[in-house]
Amino acid sequence: MENMNVFQLNIGLNNNPYTFEKITEALVVTFEGEIVGTREHMGEYEGRPEPTLVAKIVTEMDSESLRVFTTMMAMKFTQECIGMKVNEEGTLVYNPDFKGEQYTFDAEYFIEF
C-alpha cells in the first residue's frame, strides 16, 4: 500500500442532477481506489446553506490525475467548482464552463471527512 493518497472531496448537492447515492456510485466506478466513506453534511456556498457530499477515498492515483477526474466531475455534476484535498494539499477545481470569479482554497470552508 505504498504510494497511496488520501483524497477528499466536497461536492455540492444543490443544482446537482445526481443524488447522493448516484454520486457515491460514480465515485466507486471512477476511482481506482477504495472509497473509505461518503457522508452528507450541511455546508455553505456563497453564504447560503448547501447540502454537501463529503467523500474520502484512498487511491494510488496521482494528484494530477485526481485533478483531471475532479474537473470531469464538476462538469458531470453541474458544479461551479469542487473542493478537493490530496493528503494535506487543498484546491478548488473549477468547471471549465464557469465564467464567474474564482476563489482560492480556504481550509476553513473545507469539510473534512
Please report, for each region that a protein language model flagged, where it lies by residue.
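N-terminal, charge-rich interaction modules
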Residues: 1-36, 44-46, 113
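Polar/charged alpha-helical tracts
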Residues: 21, 25, 64-67, 89, ...
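Generic low-polarity alpha-helical segments
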Residues: 23, 70, 82-83
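Short, intrinsically disordered low-complexity segments
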Residues: 30-72, 76
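Conserved short beta-strand edge segments in small beta-sheet-based binding/regulatory domains
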Residues: 34-36, 76-90
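Short, low-order "capping/linker" segments at domain edges
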Residues: 48-52, 91-113
